[in-house]
């Protein structure tokens, strides 16, 4: 092959292996890194052709026969079921709590599933290595171990839509087929996958958008920033597993310092050298465990990253070009796998897999020996077993059957399940090392419900009362203990029931225990619903009182009626008519109007002023329908016509004081209806009202000059009356107009109110209860002196029929009934007060087994007295037994406990000495006499010579810090909540945690339950107090210490004597990065200058954030290069918050770039001014985007109005440094070919490149090329000297750049 290379590429190696996916990857990577894109794609094409050629010759197919289920499965399932039955027995004996049982079941099935998976692989490997499924899955062609496991192993445990694990596993696989239950549980988990995929695609897209926005202006702008800092790289480890080996992390990095071999001190690699695959491999092989490299995190370039700090462009395996937009590449690299992560859950169909703990299994049958000096602490495992936690690391002795000694190392924190000299079987779990960080735990509660009814009994249960913030009393169990439910039948009785039994009485089956009565409060006439059978009547009505009008009939008013709303008229025998204001079926209350008299006697023709003359009104009973008139008198009415207009005064066609005739135009299209004098009411040149006052003008005489006496009413018998030359009562007021003032004499219309009676003949249904009556009443509708604004007439007074109720029963309401008379369409009015009584068939609770009998004690139309019993309900005993207790639980209920024959069991002990005493609690499986085992749990009630009587019961173990819902001696029914257990559980670790967790880290959110962080570095001492609280003390080298008190609930992840670093977590949970930054900064600022302290504190948090993001992606087997995350994290940690501006122009609370504030402070030092004080801050990606220097970029991201307004107020300038700003205003972006921000690229650099060309290039220049050689790509192109005269060329470029700048 004739090639034009600056270096001789390595010769291809012969790979004598099965070429599976992994090997193919290696081959392609080799071709790409040595020969560039073009040749690598050519090779890929050739391999594809080769693959297809053979695919047509032979292929693999899947058949049912290939799905081989390992024969050990049946045995494994049998073993697991036995273990689960054992756990259930423990639970029934009250040895473990319901939570521990659940946890044990889940772990047991999970381990069984894992074991079966290993069996499947082993079975294929040993018996059928050419099995098509095995070949496909393990060559990497299609499928993975998880899917194979579901096909031929067992589907295992599934999670429900809330992410909680269902404790019923799917034991079958797809080869055997699923049962209906299996299928439904399966669909449950799979549906979750589908929904999640749909939702998370959007989440992932939004994450990418935010990342692009935060990093879009990071461009490679210079070659070397000459930084004096680097970061330390070593293997990335989590849970004792190497996630990313050092070799992979070094690839494409630039060294910060020259590396020497640890053995020979030879130079392995030079400072500023970029590391390729071979060098990285060589460094690791030479035994170097950690290397300091250049990193975007420590780059000193302002608002960019330099070539050396960034390292390789991973797309072509060589140093990144100037002008490369690395920010966008970083954002896409982190955002893109988000969509893949979403697909992960979907394919496994929600199958739960979790490496819950690393188990240590016994290598053989044997015995364990524990030394005397052994330091352990007794704990209760999550399965409710007692075990020891090792406080230090130990090597323990295990002896096999031939007494040969073997040593096994147990690390600190290991849980040991065996005691000294205890025997164990091969592959038995003897210890467990919990994986502390990867599992996300959450605090949850679970209700403990009783499975049978009976009496609550506390056994060794210590309780304490607490008052919570709301003032409620809470009973909780600080230590835990046992709670027994001693069985018996519980009956719930309402407090009003009449109990017919006494304690210790024997009751027969179907005997009446209690009776509840339905009583009528008022008495009256009984009405039963005819259609109902007496056996199941649910309600009956009692007519307490009823009144009817005998001398009036109701007819339908056809003129006013509509289909939906009929109108009725009440006609009296004397000819008076009333309009009905209520319909049949309406409910009316005291003083409510029934009907209104049809009458025009008190109607006016216009508006006016109302005056009362000689009568009183009832002020108390004011309602919407006016005031009730007491006595006789007259209403005086002074008519006037009021027009309410809202118009400009210039539009008015009349003026103040003008006398007009009827029909005069006041404003356009508005005419007066009466004649009179005009009064105008205006406000701010706007006419509100025009009033036309009828009357005549009267020139005031000299004698009457008292202006305060007007307006007034003058009657004909008044001494001054003659002066006014009028007829009838008059109303005098002043009149103002242009010429001057005069008096206006207005006519007064008098409406007489006489005391005429309306004769109502009322008839009462019962002789005793006359609670209600119908009475007529007159009401005046306006107040004394009120102005009625109207141009049309109004009614001044109305006569109503109202319902009146006895003053001692004001709450009664009556039903309106129209009772048909003898003729059609004619009705009589009845008002009836009804008492509706509910007759509940289930007065004693819902329970099916409780039998009740209800009987009626009255007949239809029977007249009963107040307080009479209407119906009775009897509660019958379900089975015969003794009344154990009658328990008044609260004001409303009372509970009765009856012990039946089935609740007590007798056990023959055949003259043996009993090993128990009366009152003891025993559990099933306990020995009660020599050779006699109790089959049921319960309490010993009686011991006779030959018999022991046991009252059966169920024990429930209550864990510590549970909240009790019952008290000792309470009676409970099946399904009642006994206690709320508080516990920690691990969430399933699928990507449901992935994306939100990445978002949480990158948005720098405070975790919900953050872990406690150490305030100083030092040595830990752990103590436990009596309350089971843990006291942690961290002692530093200078003798100072910090103390932390932890409650029993918080899980501690450090151990005694351990050395801890600054800001390391002490308890379980995710650390709060803001707190971490604060701790580091406060610690460093006491020991070094402010700038250095801020830089170092930020660097610590940066490295933590990078590792956290990597952890999440690695848990899903997604590889992302560190440098991409570093670029994003650099943007999150570039700002500081000003605390005190000193003599600078900065304000407290302002966010400034760290480098910028340091430059300002340096200037202050020179001018002897006071420098600014600040503290570093961690901003989430959204906040960083909004706080960027460019307001155009920030506004195009979120909160456009706010950003632009603030920028305008502050008078900001946008320097257009990033890509986004330039795109928005339509300029060339400053990346790639548009990169012209820096023109001081050293000329010698280009010369150097030219001089590096080897002679082989000159020789090969004129030789012919093969067809395969006309493949040019970036990697090769950069090695060609495409510039004939580099110096002249460079000058031309420089001129062009300068010209474009001038333009």
Swiss-Prot record:
EC number: 2.7.7.6
Cofactor(s) the protein needs: Zn(2+)
Catalytic reactions on record: RNA(n) + a ribonucleoside 5'-triphosphate = RNA(n+1) + diphosphate
Gene Ontology BP terms: DNA-templated transcription
Main location per the UniProt record: plastid
Record's keyword annotation contains Cell division: no
Protein function: DNA-dependent RNA polymerase catalyzes the transcription of DNA into RNA using the four ribonucleoside triphosphates as substrates.
Protein name per the record: DNA-directed RNA polymerase subunit beta''
Record organism: Rhodomonas salina (Cryptomonas salina)
